[in-house]
Amino acid sequence: MAEKQTLIDAINDRFNSQIEAVVAGVDMVTIELLPTHLLEVCTALRDDPPFNFELLLDVCGVDYLEYGMSPWRTEETPNTGFSRGFEEVIQEQIIPWNKPRFAVVYHLLSLRHNHRIRLKTYVEGDPPLVPSVIKIWSSADWYEREAFDLYGIVFEGHPDLRRLLTDYGFVGHPFRKDFPLIGEVELRYDAAQQRCVYEPVSIQPRVLVPKVIRVDSRYEKGEKENG
């Protein structure tokens, strides 16, 4: 705990006007900052002796769409059940939220001091834009590509910002909260055309599909004898 407080004090002394907040979480310290200060703060966290966060462990996106909203209050008995699966439910804002929809989170490690730290910056725009940290930590390359692919967050200055997990013709960003659970289209190989083709999604909403009971060969013999 004392080491964590020492780190917080050093952060406040060094970045007083460049950060929005410092939160002492259970697992690690979290810094919230604006995208305009991201590169300057990251460079100092890597190079300044009190920090020496020379290793970038992860970069990920977060979608706060409908954050803090709920179709009912937990202290009340809900009046909707099965119908929630296919009917629109009016949601209420339970937890106030006035920040941008998207955020980018960075996890750093100092091998010298054995410290971990988390950076969080909220990004605005359509598409949401944030500076790339690839020139500070080269390991950001695929992390930023993944966040771009899944959330549509654009990392300005990235030399090769292509999709990483989905195919290059994929439509949309699958980790966004408003992306359809069954997807927009499905991909299959067409032997006649000898290429992959996109088709409308053939999956049915499972909430309306009766339980499928498959034929079990273990019972076929007994049924024939009884028949």
From Swiss-Prot:
GO terms for cellular component: plasma membrane. The keyword Cell membrane applies. SUPFAM superfamilies: Nqo5-like. GO terms for molecular function: NADH dehydrogenase (ubiquinone) activity; NADH:ubiquinone reductase (non-electrogenic) activity; quinone binding. Transmembrane segments: none annotated. Its main location: membrane. It comes from the Bacteria. Its EC number is 7.1.1.-. It is found in: Cell inner membrane. Pfam families: Complex1_30kDa. It is an enzyme of class 7 (translocase). Keywords: Cell inner membrane, Cell membrane, Membrane, NAD, Quinone, Translocase, Transport, Ubiquinone. It is a peripheral membrane protein. It catalyses: a quinone + NADH + 5 H(+)(in) = a quinol + NAD(+) + 4 H(+)(out). NDH-1 shuttles electrons from NADH, via FMN and iron-sulfur (Fe-S) centers, to quinones in the respiratory chain. The immediate electron acceptor for the enzyme in this species is believed to be ubiquinone. Couples the redox reaction to proton translocation (for every two electrons transferred, four hydrogen ions are translocated across the cytoplasmic membrane), and thus conserves the redox energy in a proton gradient. Belongs to the complex I 30 kDa subunit family. NDH-1 is composed of 14 different subunits. Subunits NuoB, C, D, E, F, and G constitute the peripheral sector of the complex. This is NADH-quinone oxidoreductase subunit C. It comes from Coxiella burnetii (strain RSA 493 / Nine Mile phase I).
